[in-house]
């Protein structure tokens, strides 16, 4: 690293300390030529792919938007914060491991749907209704029936269509 005082190219590290959260390292350096001391901060750079939107626009991946998608789909659902965080980490990990510089928003949506399907079927259908632009009740019914056909026997989650139909008949249960 070049010295910021004399621009000499040889500096040595005289002390290193890891931050409390473990995400940065503070290094105290000394210039071999002029003897001046200075500090540097070293952080991890994790490059995530750029998201290509359906209209062709490109934007940097934003983990907050991803978290918001999960929060909206799972609003008022019995899913623990830790489970949601793990699902977000899983999607981010899949994107990072893809090794691609760009990824389509449709692929990100598919990753989200896989995670939601594991967490909560109602949240999954909520997300799918927006992601796949459901037009009417038949689209919901088709997705729910498809989901129920693919469920393993003895699944812990309630059968969606039965719950939806039962609630539809009771006022105030929306």
Swiss-Prot record:
Cofactor: Zn(2+)
PROSITE patterns named in the record: ATP_CONE (PS51161)
Cystine crosslinks: none
Any single biological process term in GO: negative regulation of DNA-templated transcription
Keywords associated with the record: ATP-binding, DNA-binding, Metal-binding, Nucleotide-binding, Repressor, Transcription, Transcription regulation, Zinc, Zinc-finger
Domain of life: Bacteria
Zinc finger boundaries on the chain: unnamed: 3-34
UniProt cross-references to InterPro entries, sorted A to Z: ATP-cone_dom, NrdR-like_N, RNR_NrdR-like
GO MF: ATP binding; DNA binding; zinc ion binding
Domain ATP-cone: 49-139
Described purpose of this protein according to its UniProt entry: Negatively regulates transcription of bacterial ribonucleotide reductase nrd genes and operons by binding to NrdR-boxes.
Family: Belongs to the NrdR family.
Protein name: Transcriptional repressor NrdR
Organism: Xanthomonas oryzae pv. oryzae (strain KACC10331 / KXO85)
Gene name as annotated: nrdR
């Amino acid at each position: 690293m070049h010295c910021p005082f004399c621009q000499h190219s040889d500096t040595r590290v005289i002390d290193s300390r890891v931050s409390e959260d473990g995400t940065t390292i503070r290094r105290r350096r000394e210039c071999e030529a002029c003897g001046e001391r200075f500090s540097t901060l070293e952080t991890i750079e994790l490059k995530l792919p750029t998201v290509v939107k359906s209209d062709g626009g490109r934007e940097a991946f934003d983990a907050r938007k991803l978290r918001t998608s999960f929060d909206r789909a799972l609003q008022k659902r019995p899913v623990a914060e830790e489970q949601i965080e793990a699902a977000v980490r899983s999607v981010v990990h899949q994107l990072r491991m893809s090794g691609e510089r760009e990824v389509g928003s449709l692929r990100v949506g598919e990753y989200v749907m896989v995670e939601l399907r594991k967490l909560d079927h109602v949240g999954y259908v909520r997300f799918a209704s927006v992601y796949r632009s459901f037009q009417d009740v038949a689209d919901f019914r088709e997705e729910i029936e498809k989901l129920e056909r693919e469920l393993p026997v003895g699944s812990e989650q309630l059968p969606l269509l039965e719950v939806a139909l039962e609630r539809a008949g009771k006022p105030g249960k929306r």
